[in-house]
Swiss-Prot record:
Keywords associated with the record: Chaperone
Any one Gene Ontology BP term: [2Fe-2S] cluster assembly
Name recorded for this polypeptide: Co-chaperone protein HscB
J domain residues: 2-74
GO CC, any one term: iron-sulfur cluster transfer complex
Quaternary state and interactors: Interacts with HscA and stimulates its ATPase activity. Interacts with IscU.
Gene Ontology molecular function: ATPase activator activity; protein-folding chaperone binding
Organism name: Klebsiella pneumoniae subsp. pneumoniae (strain ATCC 700721 / MGH 78578)
Gene3D superfamilies assigned: DnaJ domain (1.10.287.110), HscB, C-terminal domain (1.20.1280.20)
SUPFAM superfamilies reported for this sequence: Chaperone J-domain (SSF46565), HSC20 (HSCB), C-terminal oligomerisation domain (SSF47144)
Record-linked PROSITE patterns: DNAJ_2
Family: Belongs to the HscB family.
Function: Co-chaperone involved in the maturation of iron-sulfur cluster-containing proteins. Seems to help targeting proteins to be folded toward HscA.
InterPro entries to which the protein is assigned, alphabetical: DnaJ_domain, HscB, HscB_C_sf, HscB_oligo_C, J_dom_sf
Amino acid sequence: MDYFTLFGLPASYTLSLEQLAVRYQDLQRQYHPDKFASAPAAEQLAAVQHSATINQAWQTLRHPLTRAEYLLSLHGFDLASEQHTVRDTAFLMEQLELREELDEIGQAKDDARLEGFIKRVKALFDTRQQLMVDQLHNESWEAAADTVRKLRFLDKLRSSAEELEEKLLDF
């Protein structure tokens, strides 16, 4: 059973996080291992396994990138374990330039410049994420997989920038 079915939701990138959370809580109440404490060992084990599956599904579906990766896996694109990389030279050059800029900002300890950088990376991420949403909606799986690969780069860059921001604030 796929995670969307487990939560009683359509297999779609766009979903209600509120509805997902409600279903998660319902399933956790229903299958929590403590409810099976006096049951036979086989039922206890099944409850633990089902609870673990529910938790994994929750973690996967609540985050946009992992939800997209999972949806693509249902259509034959296993991005989580693939060795495929981005081949878009212009995109890769842009990433190198952004990484260099982030390094310069860190060396200069320039809070204002970092704030603008984070906003710019977020805008790049949001634009590409909307492209991915359109590709998933149109069932352009190959194009969506490529966009997810690029979103991973931007997500890591955003995380690095936010880590630098925390470091500069602590300084």
